[in-house]
């Protein structure tokens, strides 16, 4: 097995649990954002919208639920509130622990912008349906009355150098934008499927196939090129 193939397989293994070992930064989890303007802090910072996804014991993660949330909940809210968002990304994790399977929308905004986004998410009919059916067991929002992550590096991995912590969010946003647009493109091809959950099962399968066949060149190769094709140390 050549070195390039070994590195690719290692990357796939590292991603299998969706950052299972790394819990996202914690904030105050709320069922809904406060509605009064007096409750909102001044300034900007990072905000999380966390969607806790049902995972029956002994079953693998239902990754397509996160993809459904991305396509039907996050995308329309983002389109309506892009002016409130400086930088953003999505995050997944599905560890076999108490925290469980969580899909997160993470964005840098003013507290007032976060309040508007949270209020819009709460009203999303697809999210309401997922919660009613038990597919999403809980939604967690941060408290817009206080800003706990004001710096651009505040949601990056503390094990990284400060320069990487400060610049990595741009890479994560680009990858998240590519993924979200890809989900939208693929979902349009399955528009004839009336059952929403089945549609996104098919979307997830198609996205998996695209990633498996094209991710090495479209993503890994070109990122490697940006960094001058230098050796990469991978540890696990």
Language-model regions, residue ranges each:
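N-terminal export leaders
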Residues: 4-9
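An acidic, charge-biased composition feature
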Residues: 16-236
